[in-house]
Amino acid sequence: MRPRSNAGSSPPDPEEQEHAQVPSFSSTLEQAIHAALALANARRHELATLEHLLLALIDEPDAARVMKACSVDLEDLKKTLTDFIDDDLSTLVTSVEGSEAVPTAAFQRVIQRAAIHVQSSGRTEVTGANVLVAIFAERESNAAYFLQEQDMTRYDAVNFIAHGVAKDPSYGESRPVQGADEPQETPKAEAGEAKESALSKYCVDLNIKARKGDVDPLIGREAEVERAIQVLCRRRKNNPLLVGDPGVGKTAIAEGLAWKIIKKEVPEVLSGATIFSLDMGALLAGTRYRGDFEERLKAVVKELEDHPDAILFIDEIHTVIGAGATSGGAMDASNLLKPALQGGKLRCMGSTTYKEFRQHFEKDRALSRRFQKIDVNEPSVPDAIKILMGLKPHFEEHHELRYTADAIKSAVELASRYINDRKLPDSAIDVIDEAGAAQHLVSDSKRKKVLGTKEIEAVVAKIARIPPRNVSKDDAETLRDLERTLKRLVFGQDKAIEALSASIKLARAGLREPEKPIGNYLFTGPTGVGKTEVAKQLAATLGVELLRFDMSEYMEKHAVSRLIGAPPGYVGFDQGGMLTDGVDQHPHCVLLLDEIEKAHPDVYNILLQVMDHGKLTDHNGRAVDFRNVILIMTSNVGAADMAKEAIGFGRERRTGEDTAAVERTFTPEFRNRLDAVISFAPLGREIILQVVEKFVLQLEAQLIDRNVHIELTPEAAAWLGEKGYDDKMGARPLGRVIQEHIKKPLAEELLFGKLTKGGLVKVGVKDDAIVLEVQEPQKPRLTGQKPPLLTAE
């Protein structure tokens, strides 16, 4: 084969030649080239051929490693080459004394071809492996023929150099060599050396971790641990699967089981067991080519099967589904594990959440049937307190302080009430850990050595983003003042507020059935009398979330699915239900279903189990707890009948006249589950002045940032009450009167008039009309005293 001619090609750019990096020969390759020339000189050959070069490459480490991986018998090849050089190349012997052997054209082409390939690959060093591959291009040479006789092809060499895939299965662990397309470190281990254990490379020994004290002790969870041990002792399908919400302690059960094993607190059948936690990241890292991942996983499975007391723990086990699969291929980690899991030779423990279990794990029926599902529910508050008391010494040692028993109790109770995006005990552990970490931020002189309830409350307030006073408020004090507080905020509905307060106190006193919500109330009465306002103020007073649903959005039959989620096969199945997700995130809340009579009757049927058993199952089969919910429904049924005047004689408005309308609208089983139907009375004229004052104070609160104060004269208050009073429409007409006669003129003054920099607005009456007297702000006094604060009369 002749070298290609460069005739007709454009000359290379001298600037490119200057910046191009010329590859150098590795020291071992230089020695091999000198050895090839020395072999020719020793035999007084006139030319150094490819056969001389190949014989020298047998002793070059990189080339020798490639040939070994490609099943080449180096001793046999060496003997064949030596015989060929001594017998068939005898014609090259020269009689000229002291002459040096000259490389043949093929010899030079091979070296040049290897250098060009290395340079085009962006590397800087030519190794013996590159030269060995280049020899195969000289197809008519005896050197290439001898390699092919050893059943070695160019593909075998390139496959091992680039991918680390050895043709000889007995050649240790597949590894890349110098000369691959990406720079690699030279492996020090040679073929035949003991391989590192796959378990030690890709798994973590939880028993060793427990002996070192890196695992927290397992407290409680006796039922779950007993069930897991029972499954592990089975003959077949001995694979427990821990399924639960994030933060309930699934991984802690597996680690705690290892801790119990080294403490000899397990049955004799598990006394010698070792739990290995699979490191999926280490298993996948570096597996760039097909076959690498499967080879690693099979090695792990084989070693586990050879270890009769081994238990494999896979955290987040849903990640094995699809791991290592090529595009469109079905061979992933889960399919590699199935045969071992079926026969009982491999004991595997997994953990996952309900969401991933439904979305990934449950869909693979062949895999899920090999596991025995164990539900890990959120522990109760007393159980969570026990868990934290057991973990307390570890956190005290880490943070170098102490927690009081009240602090632990407060952490669990407050985390259960206010931190709703995480579950116990994880949320409570986060609270005490962060409370301890907060002390590291203060100076030594101010650092506290004992943390109590106050520090825990401050941390919960930061995590839950609520005012600290709401956290530290005593429940007993709040309940005692509940009636008085609501009466100050909502006017004219004293009887309704008294009935509501009495029902809530009854539930908080523990005299209510434990599986029911705190209260189920139906507020009835005319529009605009404060039904929705009572629910808002109740949530604010108790310091809980208000979940408000306007039932006019749920008038169609299919709209019910928005509350609990769409069924499988329908759009929105993966989004969840607005009602179930909202209560799941805020278990302690006031649930307000506004204008319930406008909803489809199917909504009433959904609420039956909520009012009776405090549970509602969403579209995924998850039961949502409503036991800490105050359910309030408002309705205007009967308001139209109450607004009608009797023919002939007038009558006095009375509360409770809408009872017949309530009975017509709601079914007996729905009404029978209500704690109370609370009727709101129409607002009287004597109440309207208090409502006027409240609206004006709300307006002043909106203007406080603009430094604008409002002073309302008694005449103006009476005028607003007279114009805004409507016994049929409640307080809403009053809001429109205030907007028309006060807010609109104020907007002009705030934007373009005298109130751009603040000031005082006096609201009076002149010629039976509202008049605004605007005073610009006074200049600051020299004494630095502030002007007295003016409030509405």
Curated annotation (Swiss-Prot):
- Origin organism is Fuscovulum blasticum
Q: Where is this region: II?
A: 451-639
Domain Clp R as annotated: residue spans: 22-168
According to its record, what are the GO cellular component terms?
A: cytoplasm
- What this protein is called in its record is ClpA homolog protein
On whether Chaperone is a keyword of this UniProt record, the answer is: yes
> NCBIfam families under this entry?
ClpA
Q: Positions of the region I?
A: 199-447
Q: Which family does it belong to?
A: Belongs to the ClpA/ClpB family.
Record has Repeat as a keyword: yes
Q: Which Gene3D superfamilies match?
A: 1.10.8.60, Clp, N-terminal domain, P-loop containing nucleotide triphosphate hydrolases
Citing just one GO molecular function, the answer is: ATP binding
Q: What is the lineage of its organism?
A: Bacteria, Pseudomonadati, Pseudomonadota, Alphaproteobacteria, Rhodobacterales
Region (Disordered) location = 1-24, 169-194
Q: Which InterPro entries match?
A: AAA+_ATPase (IPR003593), ATPase_AAA_core (IPR003959), Clp_ATPase_C (IPR019489), Clp_N_dom_sf (IPR036628), Clp_R_dom (IPR004176), ClpA (IPR013461), ClpA/B (IPR001270), ClpA/B_CS1 (IPR018368)
Note down the stretches annotated as region Repeat 1: 25-88
